[in-house]
């Protein structure tokens, strides 16, 4: 995981960032940050650890031209020691679902196109980091998380499930419970998940309608699209679409 945006770096102060009171980004300090922090830090991580996968993040507010990620990725795929094996996602400056080794969705429903390599990313609750204000009901049940895993894998996707440790590194008990019970399920049923491939078309036992919600709707509490897909069909209306 590498965030190209560093909210608290003194070389790119908050008042110069594009999220500050609706003001345009200060490109002088941005370029200084990219040259002295982002580029050297990224290259140091690659040279020191030679990662097989890089999950970039923090690109939301600016495009790849302002982030200057094209030259950075050109270096990665032409000069880095891991250039022949490294895989990247699609978060490099407003290029999601356009460019990358694989595409990502976040608290979404993934993709149905079999030609796309993709991954659904989400937390066990509604937050990626530790959120002390989350209530027990904000966390998905083990049953629903297993359903999500099966649904995503059956459509050819990868499931990245995030946990949020506390400030001292502890994993909250409710998250431990979900991980342990998912592990128990996988110990029995793992052969149906690991090393499998998607079928030539999706299969559903319900209507299986994928609804795309806006970011604003999601933050206002609109139901999770995968949860909506998980509902059992009404009596007499089940059908198998294979």
Residue ranges and their predicted role:
Residues 1-242:
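Mature catalytic domains of secreted/periplasmic carbohydrate-active enzymes
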């Amino acid at each position: 995981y590498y965030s190209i945006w560093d909210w608290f770096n003194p070389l790119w102060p908050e008042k110069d960032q594009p999220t500050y009171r609706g003001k345009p980004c200060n490109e002088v300090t941005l370029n200084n940050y990219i040259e002295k922090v982002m580029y050297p830090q990224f290259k140091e991580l690659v040279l020191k650890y030679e990662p097989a996968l890089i999950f970039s993040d923090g690109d939301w507010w600016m495009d790849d031209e302002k982030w200057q990620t094209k030259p950075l990725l050109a270096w990665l795929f032409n000069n880095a020691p891991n250039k022949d094996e490294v895989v990247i996602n699609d978060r490099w400056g407003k290029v999601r679902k356009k460019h990358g080794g694989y595409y990502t969705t976040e608290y979404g429903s993934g993709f149905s196109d079999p030609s796309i390599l993709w991954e659904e990313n989400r937390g066990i609750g509604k937050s990626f980091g530790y959120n002390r204000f989350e209530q027990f009901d904000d966390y998905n049940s083990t049953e629903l998380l297993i359903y999500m895993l099966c649904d995503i894998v059956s459509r050819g996707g990868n499931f990245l499930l995030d946990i949020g440790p506390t400030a001292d590194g502890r994993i909250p008990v409710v998250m431990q419970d979900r991980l342990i019970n998912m592990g128990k399920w996988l110990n029995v049923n793992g052969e149906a998940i690991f090393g499998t491939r998607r079928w030539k078309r999706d299969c559903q036992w319900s209507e299986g309608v994928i609804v795309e919600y806006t970011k604003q709707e999601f933050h206002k509490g609109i139901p999770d699209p995968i949860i909506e897909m998980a509902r059992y069909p009404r009596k007499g209306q089940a059908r198998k679409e294979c």
